[in-house]
């Protein structure tokens, strides 16, 4: 469990390592969520029972898309003062967190989800025909679902969940609360991703998958 949690933090779930984040699950605990999970050896971590920031999860995808190079998510490119002079931005430095070959091979391992996997129907309905990596996700009771997708140009994640005081199962087509849920990550979450990304997918250059590294195959 420890290695898995540490890898999640390295790839982008950085808030898990912040002191006090375990208080969401134990109000009197000042540990980081990462230490809380590791100390109790909670193997269910890999199934996703803990809250996750969608920006950080998208940053995990961006790390893999960048050949294992983690950079802090930042929407600001440059800042200028009133005189037109550029103002220095103090940002955390980028970091090579896993070998490039490992990141590239994992991106290829995730490349079939939208071809023959659970994300394929949504990709086809949007007319998506570009190489990409993706993963659908659904909670056991269908109370939430999500889709993570990325190319060498973009990375994005979206969730659908019931944020009402009394959450229930969710059903698809149309999306709604229901008694016996059937919402999956490959339905509305994936459809939303492809609807948003298809028009802009090639705006910043050619979309391609990196080669796999034989050391990790």
Identify the role of each PLM range:
Residues 1-19, 38-66, 109-112:
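Active-site-adjacent helix/loop patches that line small-molecule binding or acyl-intermediate pockets
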Residues 6, 28, 34-35, 202, ...:
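Polar/charged alpha-helical tracts
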Residues 32-34, 39-42, 123, 135-137:
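Short, well-ordered helical secondary-structure segments
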Residues 51-217:
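A penicillin-recognizing enzyme superfamily signal
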Residues 15, 26-31, 49-50, 91-98:
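Short, exposed beta-strand "edge-strand" segments with a Pro/Gly-rich flavor and a Y/T-containing core
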Residues 8-39, 159, 164-172:
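Active-site-adjacent bridging/hinge elements
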């Amino acid at each position: 469990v420890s290695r898995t949690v540490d890898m999640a933090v390295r790839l982008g779930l950085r808030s898990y390592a912040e002191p006090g984040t375990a208080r969401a699950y134990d109000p009197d605990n000042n540990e980081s969520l990462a230490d809380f999970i590791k100390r109790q050896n909670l193997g269910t971590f890999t199934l996703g029972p803990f809250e996750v920031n969608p920006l950080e999860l998208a940053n995990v995808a961006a790390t893999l898309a960048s050949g294992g190079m983690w950079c802090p998510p930042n929407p600001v490119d440059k800042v200028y003062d009133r005189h037109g002079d550029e103002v220095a931005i103090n940002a955390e430095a980028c970091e090579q967190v896993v070998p490039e070959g490992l990141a590239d091979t994992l991106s290829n391992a995730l490349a079939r989800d939208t071809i023959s996997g659970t994300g394929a129907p949504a990709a086809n309905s949007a007319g998506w025909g570009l190489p990409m990596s993706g993963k659908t996700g659904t909670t056991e009771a269908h109370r939430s679902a999500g889709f993570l997708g990325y190319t060498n140009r973009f990375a994005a994640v979206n969730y659908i969940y019931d944020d009402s005081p009394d959450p229930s199962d969710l059903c698809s087509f149309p999306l709604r609360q229901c008694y016996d849920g059937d919402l999956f990550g490959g339905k509305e979450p994936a459809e939303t991703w492809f609807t948003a990304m298809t028009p802009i997918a090639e705006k910043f250059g050619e979309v391609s998958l990196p080669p796999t590294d034989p050391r990790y195959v």
